[in-house]
């Protein structure tokens, strides 16, 4: 019996040729989509951070990838400095609970002066001048910022997911 086999294997019955299970709304966590864009380019000014819509994510999945679901919000990407990893119009989930105090190599949303950016951060070994970081663009047409003082950068949160429209 397909249903029994699916239960035994811990998979959805649809993977074994059966009908797709209807999604259960109680298993979703609502994540706010903010009226903010993170620039993958010269920098976007974040003037308002109001919720304009919401996305629903599987509760178990979100708890597994985020520091805590309430720390997560979605924002849009603007610009091309992070191509091919991030494209203009992509939606990214930002975990604000995974920021400066847990900093490690990865893609982060950060604020430099008034500009909100999405960039790759690489930690440099602590030398005589203390801990430094490099802020990098994945697109080689854009410059990297090497040996930055972490005190000059506000780390907003780590990017934990990207969604994009398939043209």
PLM region spans:
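Short, basic-rich loop-to-helix N-cap that marks the start of a DNA-contacting helix
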Residues: 1-7
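Short, positionally conserved secondary-structure boundary motifs
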Residues: 7-10, 14-88, 97-101, 127-128, ...
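A generic structural signal for residues embedded in beta-strands
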Residues: 94-95, 110
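Short, solvent-exposed loop/turn segments at secondary-structure junctions
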Residues: 100-103, 143
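Short coil-to-beta-strand transition motifs
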Residues: 111-117, 153-154
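Glycine- and charge-enriched low-complexity intrinsically disordered segments
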Residues: 122-167
């Amino acid at each position: 019996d397909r249903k029994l086999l699916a239960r035994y294997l811990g998979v959805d019955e649809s993977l074994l040729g059966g009908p797709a299970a209807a999604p259960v709304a109680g298993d979703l966590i609502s994540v706010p989509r903010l009226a903010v864009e993170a620039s993958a380019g010269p920098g976007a000014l974040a003037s308002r951070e109001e919720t304009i819509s919401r996305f629903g994510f599987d509760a178990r999945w979100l708890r597994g990838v985020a520091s805590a679901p309430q720390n997560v919000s979605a924002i849009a990407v603007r610009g091309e400095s992070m191509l091919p990893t991030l494209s203009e119009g992509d939606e990214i989930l930002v975990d604000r609970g995974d920021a400066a105090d847990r900093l490690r190599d990865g893609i982060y949303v950060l604020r430099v002066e008034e500009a909100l950016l999405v960039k790759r951060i690489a930690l440099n070994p602590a030398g005589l001048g203390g801990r430094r970081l490099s802020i990098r663009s994945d697109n080689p047409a854009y410059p990297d910022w090497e040996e930055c003082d972490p005190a000059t950068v506000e780390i907003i949160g780590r990017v934990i997911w990207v969604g994009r429209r398939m043209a």
